[in-house]
Regions:
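Structural alpha/beta core scaffold segments of enzyme domains
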Residues: 1-200
């Protein structure tokens, strides 16, 4: 099966996110947590009025990333749970105006005890049991039963560019262009966050 995007990628004709441009673009940056765990006490912004700032209250739909469980906010509300957790979105018509943003936007926290041991966390791991057929009977009839614990390293893909998206709003709809491995995950999350029907995203 020939990949639809194969020729464009191997010949260098494929467009990167930074190659795309639309009228009246606003460039965005994310203000992220600098501590692993804490309550947000205050935010300090020294930005001119031509900047746009959005927080969790500006999300039209429920504030969570729709993946498996609705347990991860898109933008932190009053507490951060890991370094680099998104808190604010900042936009400007000039992408160069976003450089050095960390010197003009800062968060004040009440630090809480972090957890550096993933195996001691009650939120990092999930046990999902897939049972098919009569398990007890199968075990009783088995000649050999192998029980063990396996650990594997973290796997990540090799992207041809850093992740990025461009969202183009329309009349009650949103079109998103992105460097995405799994666009259906992004689609599912955006439908919830934007509070739009699935066929409008």
């Amino acid at each position: 099966v020939r990949r639809k995007d194969g020729d464009a990628k191997v010949t260098g004709e494929a467009k990167y996110i930074d190659d795309l441009a639309f009228p009246n673009m606003i460039y965005g940056a994310t203000v992220r947590s600098t501590i692993p765990h804490g309550r947000i006490r205050a935010r300090h912004l020294t930005l001119t009025p031509d900047f746009i700032v959005a927080d969790h209250r500006d999300i039209p739909g429920p504030n969570y990333v729709a993946l498996i469980d609705p347990d991860q906010p898109c933008l932190a509300v009053d507490q951060v749970r890991h370094v680099a957790e998104p808190i604010l979105l900042v936009g400007h018509a000039d992408k160069h105006a976003l450089i050095g943003l960390e010197s003009r936007v800062s968060m004040e926290y009440d630090a809480l005890p972090p957890n550096y041991d993933a195996t001691a966390s009650d939120v990092c791991f999930k046990k999902i049991s897939i049972d098919k057929g009569d398990i007890d009977r199968g075990l009783a009839d088995a000649d050999i039963i192998v029980e063990s614990e396996y650990r594997t390293g973290h796997q990540e893909q090799l992207y041809i560019e850093t992740n990025g998206v461009i969202a183009v709003p329309g009349d009650g709809e949103m079109t998103v262009y992105g460097s995405l491995q799994c666009p259906y995950y992004v689609h599912k999350a955006l439908v919830v966050l934007l509070n739009l029907p699935a066929d409008r995203v």
